[in-house]
Amino acid sequence: MSRKSLIAGNWKMNLNHFEAIALVQKIAFSLPDKYYDKVDVTVLPPFTDLRSVQTLVDGDKLRLTYGAQDLSQHDLGAYTGDISGAFLAKLGCSFVLVGHSERRTYHDEGDALVAAKTAAALKNSLTPIVCIGEYLEIREVGEHVSHCQNQLRGSLAGLSPEQIGNVVIVYEPVWAIGTGRVASAADAQEVCEAIRKELGALASPQVAETVRVLYGGSLNAKNIGDIVAQQDVDGGLVGGASLDGAQFATLAVIAAGGPLP
């Protein structure tokens, strides 16, 4: 089955709302409309930028989409500092990151919470981009595949096969996040193939063939082509390179199969 590539830009805690507008304008200028037929492009700004991005995307009728970097497992109530998926949906978000390694590491988010947030995203018609991945010490002892499959099961616990079909999965080896190190194309394929196999066990092989599985970790114009060319890699979650509009657009063009404009 042919799955449309997805390139998602995770801005992390960078850029105020003025800077966000400038970056989205740069991406739109650098990425001609014809490429959107082959690749979906989304940006994931900080919460405080979302309204400005929405106004620009809607006003200029841009084809890229946008989403958030996290959400609450709750819809409403006395949860100080939380952001509801219902609020994100009202802002026109299409996607939301769930379980990024930085949330798991710095905020102690475990698989059960990730599963609850994933369910909350789906409840509010948001597409959750669920992140899983291993630390270097796990890879070095050869347990990276089983670790990722276990993490996937925990992060999707309680979801129906139909719900699983509406999720995007990201394999982000923690040792490659912001380090400049990157998994080889073969490394990415090995784990993404195992993820798809596990999705087949959790839902069905048919559902697994429809789910987009991305790679994340120090992606750039030199390495993304080989990685997204792998059979089970359907795009990328881009970190630092997503803060440069021209570079991010180039990654999207490569994921679309080129040629560069």
UniProtKB/Swiss-Prot annotation:
Q: Which family does it belong to?
A: Belongs to the triosephosphate isomerase family.
The name of this protein is: Triosephosphate isomerase
Which biological process annotations from GO are given for this protein?
Answer: gluconeogenesis; glyceraldehyde-3-phosphate biosynthetic process; glycerol catabolic process; glycolytic process
Per the entry, what this protein does is: Involved in the gluconeogenesis. Catalyzes stereospecifically the conversion of dihydroxyacetone phosphate (DHAP) to D-glyceraldehyde-3-phosphate (G3P).
Q: Which UniProt keywords apply?
A: Cytoplasm, Gluconeogenesis, Glycolysis, Isomerase
Give the EC number.
Answer: 5.3.1.1
Q: In which pathway does it act?
A: Carbohydrate biosynthesis; gluconeogenesis; Carbohydrate degradation; glycolysis; D-glyceraldehyde 3-phosphate from glycerone phosphate: step 1/1
Indicate which residues the UniProt annotation says bind substrate.
N10, W11, K12, G178, S218, G239, G240
Q: Which reaction does it catalyse?
A: D-glyceraldehyde 3-phosphate = dihydroxyacetone phosphate
Q: Which InterPro entries match?
A: Aldolase_TIM (IPR013785), TIM_sf (IPR035990), TrioseP_Isoase_bac/euk (IPR022896), Triosephosphate_isomerase (IPR000652), Triosephosphate_isomerase_AS (IPR020861)
Source organism of the structure: Mycobacterium leprae (strain TN)
Assembly and binders: Homodimer.
